[in-house]
Amino acid sequence: MYLDHFVVQNFRNLKKLDIDFDPNVNIFIGKNAQGKTNLLEAIYFLALTRSHRTNSDKELIGFGGEYTNLLGHVRKSQVDLTLRVLITQKGKKVWINRVEQAKLSKYVGQLNAILFSPEDLELIKSAPALRRRFMDQEFGQINAEYLYFASKYRQVLLQKNNYLKQLAKGKTKDQVFLDVLSDQLAGIAAEVIFRRFKFLRYLSHYASDVYAHISLGGEKLAIAYHPSVSTIEADDTVEEIYQKILANFERNKAVEMRKGTTTSGPHRDDIEFKLDGKNAHLYASQGQQRSIALSVKLAEIQLVHQLTDEYPLLLLDDVMSELDHTRQSALLNYIHGKTQTFITTTDLEGISWEIIKKPRVYHMQSGKISFEKEN
């Protein structure tokens, strides 16, 4: 799939853009704070209806504006689509081929996009919250069921935590309703965890293959999922996971009532990256950690293709300068001829032109874009 036409209205500092993209490689060059990252964020938002930089959609509306409008024409192997997202102070709406969609889950997945930024290089050594966000964003865009259950889990978790706070403050003593919420949350959590195990098995397989090609040390990469409920195992059924979570909630009821928060569940789970069985966070060098992060991103591309039969868009936000020549070449060779790629950079120095063939180069300044050349 590829995005061949994109219209942006009032997205951060991008007042009005109307762009035709090359189906292969598009490079955006400009100084910092000119709008390059904002453009990639807009493409990402068109695909996933969420930003990788903020949890507040309102922040995306340009200064002094009342709304943000994104419109994209997407070409896929079997069909062409027109996608639209409208953001206002009241919320957001989405359309597929001019038909408004009542549920975001019906929209997300029509256009797949993988974003790779310098922050992703910190995936291995960052806090668990970033790795959980990684799972929710990447798995959610390729599976509507996961997106639904992850969203529902956040809603019920908030409801349960609010009720726990009331119990902690003595504003209510009704534990029956708490049990109802715990039962509901356990059922949804089981669906989320079951799917995380499934997707991580795929991702670990592909990432291991990629790492074997781009690393020089010969180590074997593996990705392990660690539920906060330690009794849960990778081959458990949804029902078995549900029963274990529910039992854990019951054991920890007094603690949760005292603390006013849910102490276990998908919102407390984590991923571990291992090299030859050792925790990469603790034992891998910085170079090895970067190779792991790169392998995971490239594996995502293969995972999306495996599950959707389409290659996703690849958004490389100022990441080329963070990769040495070996890793940059591995990245470009892997995606060559597969994905429509968008690259932001402050200059064209150091880019492996022997791999990138005839990219379309644009210049960005103060939120405006001009077609510069095909290199």
UniProtKB/Swiss-Prot annotation:
Gene3D superfamilies: P-loop containing nucleotide triphosphate hydrolases, RecF/RecN/SMC, N-terminal domain. It comes from the Bacteria. ATP binds at residues 30-37. Its main location: cytoplasm. Keywords: ATP-binding, Cytoplasm, DNA damage, DNA repair, DNA replication, DNA-binding, Nucleotide-binding, SOS response. It is found in: Cytoplasm. This is DNA replication and repair protein RecF.
